[in-house]
A protein has these predicted regions:
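Pro/Thr/Ser/Gly-rich low-complexity, intrinsically disordered linker/stalk tracts
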Residues: 4-48, 111-152, 215-257, 323-360
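Recognizes extended acidic, P/S/T-rich segments that occur
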Residues: 33, 59-88, 162-194, 270-300, ...
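Short, solvent-exposed loop/turn segments at the edges of extracellular beta-sandwich modules
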Residues: 1, 100-105, 206-211, 312-317
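Extracellular acidic loop/turn motifs
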Residues: 47-54, 65-66, 150-158, 170-171, ...
């Protein structure tokens, strides 16, 4: 009888191995949801710690668990990279993984959540100077505002916008591209805007994989730092006056102001007391009217008052003040003329008197008749020598 020999045994393995979930992308960069690469796909996974593990198989597909892009391929690594592909825009690609143990038992198939190929930049929208409507002029001296709508990226989505500023359309001679996040407005501060210079804001969008859109540019906004210009202001509502004895009202009018750029928005008026250098009536918006009457006043006799007018344009610039030549409040009648002398002949009467010295004298009234202290007005004169008949 021979000596018996024994094999080293065989273990019956009826249990399938386990396998983790594959992740799209390379190790250390997190889960990849989108990519711009059309040539390759990468996946990685945590190692299976079971001692019976023999190898892994991976595939890439356009459906979960499939292998239409890369068929099942054996590996002992925990990363799979495939090249020389021709991936399609907006298509989702899945990494699929299974493990085999030493007995040849396969694990279940585990699939990634997929990576979408994004080859194109965002779609551009509309941009305007301003927030709610397109502005043509700005009164700002150090900032510009723009807003935009209808930008879109239907695959990976918009990650951020960039803006720049120039003095010609599309140029960036004032401010180079500046990232501002996924916002729809920009208040570009820290600028030095020059009067009557037109500025253009350009914007572009970048999606989550780095594709950028075409550039869109505003139609331009012009800095307007000068207020409206006036010409003449006149005391009274018609012909200019220099004196009045009304203490409770004051009237004036003026030629409409003009503004070459943003345009006149409204006039403002005030009543100024020249004598005590203060405003009797403060500045009031009177719209585009060119006449004003102040009521309910308490004017002071002997004081001179001027009408002050200024214009405000559409972007808020206030122009220089123009003023009337002033009205003296006069409540004192001139004294009666002195030293009246009359020379009588058969053909005429010559009257002469000492001229009054009041600076506000208007004229003399000459009365005549056949009785003492006649009341019939014959005429008026500025001179102190007249012929009555």
């Amino acid at each position: 009888m021979s000596v018996p020999f024994s094999s080293n045994g065989i273990t019956v393995d009826l249990f399938d191995p386990t396998v983790g979930i594959p992740f799209d992308g390379v190790v250390g960069e997190g889960e990849l949801d989108y990519q711009a690469n059309t040539n390759s796909l990468v996946a990685h996974w945590a190692p299976t710690l079971e001692p019976e593990l023999d190898y892994y198989e991976y595939s890439f597909s356009t459906t979960i668990g499939g292998d239409d892009i890369i068929p099942w391929t054996a590996t002992t690594d925990t990363i799979a990279t495939v090249d020389s592909l021709n991936l399609i825009h907006a298509q989702i690609y899945f990494a699929n993984l299974r493990a085999f143990d030493l007995a040849g038992n396969p694990s279940f198939v585990s699939s990634s959540n997929g990576v979408t190929v994004d080859l194109y930049g965002p779609i551009t929208g509309i941009i305007i100077d301003g927030l709610s409507e397109d502005e043509i002029y700005t009164g700002a001296i150090d900032s510009l505002v723009a807003s935009w709508t209808d930008f879109a990226d239907t695959v990976s989505g918009i990650q951020y916008f960039e803006y720049g500023v120039g003095t010609t359309s599309g140029n960036l001679d004032i401010r180079e591209w500046t990232e501002i996040g996924p916002v729809l407005t920009i208040n570009a501060g820290g600028l030095t805007l020059i009067d009557v210079t037109t500025y253009y804001i350009s914007v572009k969008a970048t999606d989550l994989v780095g594709n950028f859109s075409e550039i869109v540019t505003t139609n331009g906004i012009t800095a307007d730092h000068s207020g409206p210009v006036g010409t003449i202001a006149t005391d009274s509502d018609s012909t200019d006056i220099d004196l009045q004895n009304d203490l409770v009202s004051f009237s004036g009018h003026w030629e409409s102001f003009s503004d070459e750029y943003s345009g006149l928005a409204y006039h403002e008026t005030a009543l100024y007391n020249v004598t005590n250098a203060s405003y009797e009536e403060n500045w009031t918006n009177v719209g585009i009217d060119t006449t004003i009457t102040f009521y309910g006043l308490d004017l002071i006799a002997g004081s001179t008052y001027e009408l002050h007018v200024r214009g405000v344009d559409a972007v808020g610039n206030t122009g220089a003040i123009i003023n009337s030549d002033g009205v003296l409040i006069d409540l004192t009648a001139p004294i009666a003329p002195l030293d009246l002398v009359g020379w009588f002949t058969t053909g005429r009467i010559l009257l002469e008197w000492t001229a009054n010295t009041e600076v506000d004298l208007g004229y003399y009234s000459i009365y005549g008749g056949t009785e003492n202290n006649p009341t019939d007005l014959l005429f008026t004169s500025m001179e102190n020598t007249v012929e009555a008949f």
